[in-house]
């Protein structure tokens, strides 16, 4: 009986689709090399996924700046679920970064990798040219639900 109720709840609640991203960010921008702590990269990835509607998120990072002062590119792997698009609503989302929220190249890379996996997002406007770590970036997105 419990199994039937659980199956019914899953069918009624709609479908979810498992997604994942995996990439390495080398940190080359503006003629400079940038390195990041994995905790920062994981937090940024998690926050963008949540903003774009992901659930059941698992983000893993390797490399980066470690306790022994080792500095390597960061490799990110994330798995997450996205709900099926029902087409009943659209949400406008803006993502902005400026000099006070640096790491332009890293943040733009994370956003672009996530967007590659989403069919329900339309990019209306973007400024993603990161000449420097402190460059501004901007994405204006329509997200269908």
Spans of features found by a protein language model:
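Extracellular/luminal Pro/Thr/Ser-rich low-complexity repeat and linker "mucin-like" segments
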Residues: 35-41, 101-110
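N-terminal secretory signal peptides
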Residues: 19-66
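Acidic/histidine-rich, surface-exposed loop or edge segments in extracytoplasmic proteins
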Residues: 18-33, 87-102
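Positively charged n-region of N-terminal signal peptides that target proteins for export
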Residues: 1-5
């Amino acid at each position: 009986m419990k199994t039937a109720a659980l199956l019914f709840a899953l069918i009624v609640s709609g479908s979810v689709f498992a997604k994942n991203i995996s990439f390495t960010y080398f940190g080359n921008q503006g003629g400079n090399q940038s390195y990041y702590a994995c905790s920062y990269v994981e937090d940024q990835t998690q926050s963008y996924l949540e903003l774009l509607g992901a659930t059941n998120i698992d983000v893993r990072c390797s490399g980066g700046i470690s306790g022994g002062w080792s500095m390597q590119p960061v490799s990110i792997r994330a798995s997450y679920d996205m709900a099926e698009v029902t087409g009943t609503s659209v949400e406008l989302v803006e993502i902005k970064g400026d000099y006070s929220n640096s790491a332009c190249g890293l943040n733009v890379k994370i956003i672009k990798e996530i967007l590659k996996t989403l069919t329900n997002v339309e990019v209306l406007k973007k400024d993603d040219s990161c000449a420097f770590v402190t460059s501004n970036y901007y994405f204006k997105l329509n997200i269908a639900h």
